[in-house]
UniProtKB/Swiss-Prot annotation:
GO terms for cellular component: cytosol; small ribosomal subunit. Keywords: Ribonucleoprotein, Ribosomal protein, RNA-binding, rRNA-binding. It comes from the Bacteria. PANTHER family: 30S RIBOSOMAL PROTEIN S20, SMALL RIBOSOMAL SUBUNIT PROTEIN BS20C. It comes from Rippkaea orientalis (strain PCC 8801 / RF-1). GO terms for molecular function: small ribosomal subunit rRNA binding; structural constituent of ribosome. HAMAP family: Ribosomal_bS20 (MF_00500). This is Small ribosomal subunit protein bS20.
Length: 97
């Protein structure tokens, strides 16, 4: 256990940041899952409506990833890798149909 006042404060700050980061990462994962589901639906039925849903999901996911990188929740390479996975999924479906 911490002995000094400043160490106790650091423990409190670390816990606060951990919970904040956990919420951000959870939101990123949720938006990515929604995007992959939208891409799969677009692959099964490629209509302009489904494409617009995919684009909205992509925009939301990209935005949340970029904000997580900006706030140092994710490393920039990790954010870039996640965005590349999203783009790759759509590209594979687009070339298949």
């Amino acid at each position: 256990m911490a002995n000094s006042k400043s160490a106790l404060k650091r423990i409190a700050v670390a816990e606060r940041n951990r919970l904040h980061n956990k919420a951000y990462k959870s939101a990123v994962r949720t938006l990515m899952k929604k995007y992959f589901e939208a891409v799969q639906a677009y692959g099964n039925n490629p209509t302009p409506d489904n494409l617009s849903v995919v684009e909205q999901c992509m925009s939301a996911a990209y935005s949340k990833i970029d904000k997580a990188v900006k706030r140092h929740v994710l490393h920039r390479n990790n954010g870039a890798r996640k965005k590349a996975r999203l783009a790759k999924a759509l590209k594979q479906v687009a070339t298949a149909s």
